[in-house]
């Protein structure tokens, strides 16, 4: 028996409402802290989602590049079947210039968008939701 296509009109909410499952991620607002050899830059991660594996519908946390390195290593160990994309490369000169910081911010955002967009990681990773949502995320707990 063949089923007929659904010909009813969609409501305004169905057309323009939030998608069934969505996850938006943004890396923004880099801030440089400290002086001299103790300087570092961290980045704000904004996450909006309705995926049940994530405890919060909206969250904002700050992470350093070194946190992203640990996070990526944990993902690789945790998810052997998934190829984890590379992070933007390390920078050794002018690493606190606006251009370098903006390039790194864009690279970290691209990395996170790929990672959070992967269905196996969205539902199977133990570290993903914590990294993008928990302000007290501890790299040593993994």
Curated annotation (Swiss-Prot):
PX domain ranges (all copies): 21-138
UniProt entry tagged with the keyword Iron: no
Binding site for a 1,2-diacyl-sn-glycero-3-phospho-(1D-myo-inositol-3-phosphate): 64, 66, 90, 95, 104
Domain of life according to the entry: Eukaryota
Keywords for this protein: Cytoplasm, Golgi apparatus, Lipid-binding, Membrane, Protein transport, Transport
Compartments in which it is found: Cytoplasm; Golgi apparatus membrane; Prevacuolar compartment membrane
Example GO biological process: late endosome to Golgi transport
Known function: Required for retention of late Golgi membrane proteins. Component of the retrieval machinery that functions by direct interaction with the cytosolic tails of certain TGN membrane proteins during the sorting/budding process at the prevacuolar compartment. Binds phosphatidylinositol 3-phosphate (PtdIns(P3)).
UniProt remark on domains: The PX domain binds phosphatidylinositol 3-phosphate which is necessary for peripheral membrane localization.
Name of the protein in its database record: Sorting nexin-3
Gene: snx-3
């Amino acid at each position: 028996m063949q089923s007929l296509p659904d010909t009813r009109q969609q409501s305004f909410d169905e057309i323009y409402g939030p998608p069934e499952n969505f996850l938006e991620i943004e890396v923004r607002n880099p801030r440089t802290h400290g002086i001299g050899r103790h300087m570092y830059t961290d980045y704000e991660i904004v996450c909006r989602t309705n995926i049940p594996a994530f405890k919060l519908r909206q969250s904002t946390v700050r992470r350093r590049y070194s946190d992203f390195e640990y996070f990526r290593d944990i993902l690789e160990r945790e998810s052997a079947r998934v190829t984890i994309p590379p992070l933007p490369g390390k920078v050794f000169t002018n690493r606190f210039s606006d251009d370098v910081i903006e390039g790194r911010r864009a690279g970290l955002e691209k990395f996170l968008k790929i990672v959070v967009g992967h269905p196996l990681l969205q539902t199977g990773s133990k570290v993903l939701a914590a990294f993008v949502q928990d302000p007290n995320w501890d790299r040593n707990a993994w």
